[in-house]
Amino acid sequence: MRIAVPMTVLATAFTCTLATAPAHARGRVFVASYGNDSNPCTFGSPCKTFQNAVNAVDAGGEVTAIDSAGFGPINITKAVTITSSDGVEAGIVPTPGGNAITINTTGDVFLRGLTLEGENSGYDGISLTSADTVVGIVHCVIRHFTHDGIALLPNGNLTLSILNTIASNNGNDGITITPQLPGTNVTGVIDHATTSHNANGTGIYVTSASGNAFITIINSVSSNNFNYGISTYSTVGPGLLVTMRDTVTAHNKVGFFADGNSAMTFAHSTAIDNGNDVYINTNATGVSYGDNHLATKVVSGTLIHQTLF
């Protein structure tokens, strides 16, 4: 025997089912100076630290800082965006000897509007060792770390974008990029970056003993670094190329330095008041498009001049 069930009953049952469904999905969560890590990380009840918020958000979700404060170091093990609201300074101070941000995940990681302060005791500002990752670092300030400001050492393929970012006053390099495994590729762009006063290293250092790296640097400035403004080094053949346009190196030991089997190309770039403006070492390749400016005209090695087009 069939019993007819009124549609209003079915609708009520369906509504109740939805109402009792688990509400665990968190595509966007929040932190604030007045937050508490026992909160659910909503806008009305934000968390206190970035780490708790990252733990709470879904993979691929977003963590937003509502107001200016220090929100603690982060270990990132999922795809995530970490950003600050407009006008907010979202600070991260690591524990002594630790990193401000450690990235060890596949997928996309996007960091925007963060201020990483090492206080001359933190190790790296941003440390990445993961594989098959896309990383974006935008409008960030990274300073006073004992080692590198940004250390990208992927164990697989990596696509990177570093935009409008400052890496300064660190103990070693401002930005270092080093693929770790044979057959892997690191590709990306550094645009409007400032790397300066890095004490014992280089503003931007791209190096490899195994994988390939193809990096474009545009509209950037590297100055007052202890060793080199922008440097490349490879021991594995022609798989490392850094292309520069509208980029300035100044007041470094060497402005542009290519070593090993690496290659550099220059267009509409400037080297001024470096100990040596351009140094192309044995086996390295330097290509100039003829529209660059060397203030002191000091060039070591051979530059290949290409026709402008």
Regions flagged by a language model, labelled:
Residues V93-T102, N120-T129, H144-P154, N169-N185, ...:
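Extracellular beta-strand/beta-solenoid scaffold signature
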Residues D58-A59, G70-T83, G91-V134, D148-N155:
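Extracellular beta-strand-rich solenoid/capping regions of secreted or surface-exposed proteins
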